[in-house]
Amino acid sequence: MEPIHEGGEAESQFAPADRDSSVMRVIGEEDLHGFTFEGLKRKLGIHSETLSRILARLEDQDFLAKTENGYVVTDRGRYLTGTSRTGHQTSGIVLLSTLLPAYQNGRVVSGLMGRWFGPLRWLGYSKEEDGMTLKWITEGGRIQVDAIFSQEELVIEGRIMDGEDLSAAVAASHQLVGYISRLYDQGHQRPHYQHPDSQGVFDN
C-alpha cells in the first residue's frame, strides 16, 4: 500500500495524517481485524508513547475501536486499508499443514486468542470468508508465526527477518501445534465456548 496523501476535500477528511498512515498500512498489509497494543508495538518497533498517541488519534477518527481484548478495525478503517476479506494471502514459509475436525474450530480458535507460546507473543487476527488467521510475533519482532484455520485444515506459516534462524520459528510452531492438539483432545471434556470475535466464521 502506498503512503496516504491528502488529495482533495473528501479525501483529506477521511485519510489519517501522514505520521499515522504507516500504522494503518501495516494493519492493511496484515489484514488485521483485531490486535493488541503490545503486539502491534513489536510489529512496528516503535516507542509505546508514540504508538499510544497514534492509536488514540485513529480511534478518535473512527478507524479503530478499543475493546477489552485490544483494538478492532472498524468498517471505516477496513475501507481505508483496502482489506479484501477474500482469503488469506500467503506471504510466509509453510512450516506445517494438517487436517482438523472442522466442528471444533470455533472453540479451539477461542482458546488460542490472546495466548503466548514460548517466544511467541499474541499479535492479533484476521478473518477470511472460510476461516480465521491468528498471528503471533516474537519480542523483538523478527519472527512472526501465523495459524491459518479454514473449515478442515490448519496451516502454520512463518515469516522471518534476514539473519534469523528458521529453526527458531519451527520450534515455536511446534509449541503452538502442541497446544492446539491439547485443545482438540479436551473438546469432549469442556463446555463449548466461542470467543465473540470468532462468531460467524465457523459453523459449530
Task: Report the location of each language-model feature.
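Basic amphipathic alpha-helical segments that dock to polyanions
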Residues: 27, 40, 51-61
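Short Lys/Arg-enriched alpha/beta "domain-start" segment
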Residues: 84-133
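Charged, low-complexity intrinsically disordered regulatory/assembly segments
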Residues: 119-204
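Accessory beta->alpha helical hairpin/"wing" motif in late/C-terminal subdomains of nucleic-acid enzymes
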Residues: 68-82
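Short acidic, hydrophobic short linear motifs in intrinsically disordered regions
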Residues: 32-43
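Short alpha-helical segments that sit at the start of domains
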Residues: 1-25
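A short, conserved structural fragment
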Residues: 59-69
